[in-house]
Amino acid sequence: MADAYCLTNFIDFSLSLSLPLKHHNRIKYTCFDISDSYIIFGASSGSLYLFNRNGKFLLLIPNKHGAITSLSISANSKYVAFATQRSLICVYAVNLSAQATPQVIFTHLDQSVQVTCIHWTQDEKQFYYGDSRGQVSLVLLSSFIGHSLLFNMTVHPLLYLDSPIVQIDDFEYLLLVSNCTKCILCNTEYEDYKQIGNRPRDGAFGACFFVSPQESLQPSRIYCARPGSRVWEVDFEGEVIQTHQFKTALATAPARIQRPGSGTDELDANAELLDYQPQNLQFAKVQRLNDDFLLAFTELGLYIFDIRRSAVVLWSNQFERIADCRSSGSEIFVFTQSGALYSVQLQTLQSHAVSLIQQSKLLPCANLLRQHVRYFADKAREDYELKQLNPLKQLLIERQEYELLNDISVIFDAITQCTGSALDTHSSGGSSATTERSLSGGSSSRAPPKGVYVLENAFCDNLKQPLKTGHFKDALLTVTGKFGKNIIKYKFNIFAEEQQQLVRELIPASERSLPFKDIKARYESGSEDQEEEIVRRCKKPAPQVPHISPEEKTLYNLYLIAKSAKFSRTQCVDRYRAVFDEYAAGELVNLLEKLAQVMVEHGDTPDQAQRNCYEMYFDYLDPEMIWEVDDATRDHIAAGFVLLNTSQNAEIVKCEHCSFPLRFDTSCQYHELGAVLLRYFWSRGEQLKCFDVVQSVPALLDVLAKFYLAEQNLTKVVAIVLNYGLPELLADVGKQLSVSAWGRCFEQFVELQRGGRLVCANCECISGVEQEQLGRHFFYNWNCFLNIALDHMSAGDTLALIFKWSSYIPNDAIDREFYSRCLLKG
């Protein structure tokens, strides 16, 4: 089974950090970094504060060049690069000698530029930095031969991007740069640059290399954060392999830091009852943690992912206003906006439990086991090391922690199964006796003394040897007659009410010979003074209920949601969003096809069922996901879009030569989805697919007009604008039309008014249109057309075109208000 993890070894460095600043209340720490030897802080005063990894203050490095905004320490801890608010990039050579004068060299940058990130290479003499202008530069350091004393630094610009740099990482000759719109992979050896993925984004998202220690078993990868709690997995050629979606997986309870005496067991018990929503997050920085995990953070939480399994390891909201994080091995350092620093360690639950035992913290260990009973029970059957937990049982009996012992007894039974040896079973209370039983088949058991009740251990029936004469099964507890049945009843009430469900999940029903309720009933009905015998009872098999698979339940629930939405005429996307989030794109398409069959079985026509399923899908679908789904899913979306926008009653006037739409209804369902679909096809050079969609859904011609406008194909732009017949489209396109283009538009508008002739946007041939078709919309009159033209041209140019075509303009076609606007515009 997969390991479960927790955050342990919490350290608060607040006291250590406050000592150097105790006489300087106005100075604040602004940024930090760590190495194997040091923790270093930049401050608002411009100085550097150097500590060892235990938090002991070592050295103050003064600096008079302004507050420090970013810093990074080299891998060998010899140099610290930092940037200041006054647009300086500086390097400090670490020297802890009391007699040495701190050596800092610097170079000036453009005053309008701020450094946003710094990254050292494995070579101690060079580092990269990115700035707010989008520029990435390489800094080379020079030092005296054989000494760490610096005497020069040179800056070499490498990349000029379109937005501020967010994160930089490198591996050998590869450089990875993430800015606010995209990720760039650079081969510095061949000066080759490639954008990762095709879809731009907006915001700070990080990216990093994840180099595998065993390349043959698991290849190295690049991981890029994406909007909506997604992560791209990318190979070293810059090709996106897959997208990991963690939005739904993060709808779990946050992990609490394991601290003795913190009461996390009670808090975690309450946390399980809460309903956690999916998290839509933006990760501005991602980094490697240990050899297996990816660490990310937001202002409100830490997030650890196992990308290889596409799983969330844990997330924690125990820190407030996180400013930055660093990882070192399994240790995580968290720096907050208030200037505080904390560290925690990522450990498996198993390792943490063993470490608590080794530190003689037995009661905290028992509470940890109770929080994660199922995990430890499964682990105990696999791992012999957990036999170290056995001392817990004696401690709990001595302290009379019977409830806690009952809660975790399944773990001790599993340890017995793993070790193959019998556990001593202790009596409850201070005067409890011990009944020893042999597991060997040849030995016999003594009958218990009068007043001692031996209760069958329902957890371990499958571990027992076959019964022989005089044998008793393993007992969970042996209880002297002094305590009677009340304490036994109390214990099994706990089992019946709190752990019955857990036992059913862990032990198959066929292996539980005596249910809890039968045990409980016998002790309630028996006499306190009489010796009782527990008899194996055979339960009559319950009548079989028709089995319904989880998928069938899901389909039925979706059908009920769709039916209620149909009658209430409301959107119910929030009710089925959580269901859809659990499926990959291809799986979701298959699910909807099965849902359509269910709708047909309940009386819908095949066409209506298909439309209903498409509407549910499109209400849920983010149009931007079209860029990331596979081709089959994308074609499915295109087919559904055409189906929903195809009406038998729609009146479309088509070209006489090529049957391309000329006049049509401009209403469109899911227009944004269709626009993204066209943009995808057009960007891939698949213009034929664009025209197939547009011919079926001509309301998307406004999107096509903008494509042609970008290519300066004004003939098609003007044709589409006049055919589309919406003032909003002409007003939008008119911003980019020149005076000559407006002249061409005037010419075609005159032809339209004179004879009802439209130019086909496909074949560019002229076709006649009935005047009734033209008079249905306000756009096709001179007042509307000229007022839009006046918005984008000078009054003189507009009047010149009117004068040119005045013989074709009716006398009463233009209102006085238009001429008044011309006079006001000058």
Curated annotation (Swiss-Prot):
Tissue expression summary: Expressed in eye pigment granules.
Superkingdom as given in the UniProt entry: Eukaryota
Gene3D superfamilies: YVTN repeat-like/Quinoprotein amine dehydrogenase (2.130.10.10)
Organism: Drosophila melanogaster
GO molecular function: pigment binding
Protein name according to UniProt: BLOC-2 complex member HPS5 homolog
The WD repeat ranges on this chain: 22-61, 63-102, 110-149
Role noted for this protein: Has a role in the biogenesis of eye pigment granules. Eye pigment granules are specialized forms of late endosomes or lysosomes. Biogenesis of pigment granules in the eye requires molecular components required for protein delivery to lysosomes.
Family of this protein: Belongs to the HPS5 family.
Biased composition (Polar residues): 422-446
Leftover remarks: Pink was the second eye color gene identified by Morgan and colleagues, mutant flies were isolated in June 1910 just 2 months after isolation of the first white mutant allele. Another mutant allele of pink, peach, was isolated by Bridges in 1913, and according to a review published by Bridges and Morgan 10 years later, these alleles represented the first case of multiple allelomorphs described for an autosomal gene in Drosophila.
Region (Disordered): 422-447
GO cellular component labels: BLOC-2 complex; cytoplasm
InterPro entries found in the cross-reference section: Beta-prop_HPS5-like, HPS5, TPR_HPS5_insects, WD40/YVTN_repeat-like_dom_sf
Effects seen without this gene: Flies exhibit defects in vesicular transport to lysosomes and therefore can alter eye color.
Single GO biological process annotation from the record: developmental pigmentation
Keywords: Pigment, Repeat, Sensory transduction, Vision, WD repeat
